[in-house]
Amino acid sequence: MLGLRLIVGLGNPGSEHTKTRHNAGFRFVDGLVQREGQRWMLESKLFAHVARVFIAGQWVWLLRPVTFMNLSGKSICAGLSFWKIKPEQMLVAHDELDFPPGAVRLKFDGGHGGQNGLRDITKLLGHGRFHRLRVGIGHPGHKDRVVNWVLGCPTCEENIAIDAALERASAVLPLVVAGDFDEAMKKLHTVV
């Protein structure tokens, strides 16, 4: 399996969205940038902030679209084309309603599952053959409450659980970057 060359965090731009559940993907890549002592740089032709981090002996691009979630594909496709990266070499970190806060899972391929950022990416790519980091944010219990839920801020307890999940995901990232996706999944998905 090909190793990773690009990690994307999904979220919505603007200070009013910074701490929302929907920005779990941004939280993941922001954590990587901070941990590695890097800085985001605006790359207007990619409609994104970009950074590079050194993981598992190689440089990996990080991309944080400046478009809203439902238009993320434009930025991602621009990045893939500009850096000549195959979708199979990309990991997209996003919020996941189907998992409780604190749960985090890796997945390769599939549909969008109702996640609007993934919907736009798969539409523009024409397929879903890329890696995903699914960060649990919980579900409000009824589909009519989903929009307010994802655009709302997690509770203190939920934030602690989400942060712990992002730390666990960061710990297996060297395996993912090196192309050992199965081992990364085994470590991340095994509850000790």
From Swiss-Prot:
Family: Belongs to the PTH family.
SUPFAM superfamilies with a match to the protein in the record: Peptidyl-tRNA hydrolase-like
CC per GO annotation: cytoplasm
Organism of provenance: Xylella fastidiosa (strain 9a5c)
The protein's Enzyme Commission number: 3.1.1.29
Function as written in the Swiss-Prot or TrEMBL entry: Hydrolyzes ribosome-free peptidyl-tRNAs (with 1 or more amino acids incorporated), which drop off the ribosome during protein synthesis, or as a result of ribosome stalling.
Protein name: Peptidyl-tRNA hydrolase
PROSITE patterns linked: PEPT_TRNA_HYDROL_1
Upper lineage: Bacteria, Pseudomonadati, Pseudomonadota, Gammaproteobacteria, Lysobacterales
Keyword presence, Translocase: no
Residues forming the catalytic site: H22
GO BP term, example: protein quality control for misfolded or incompletely synthesized proteins
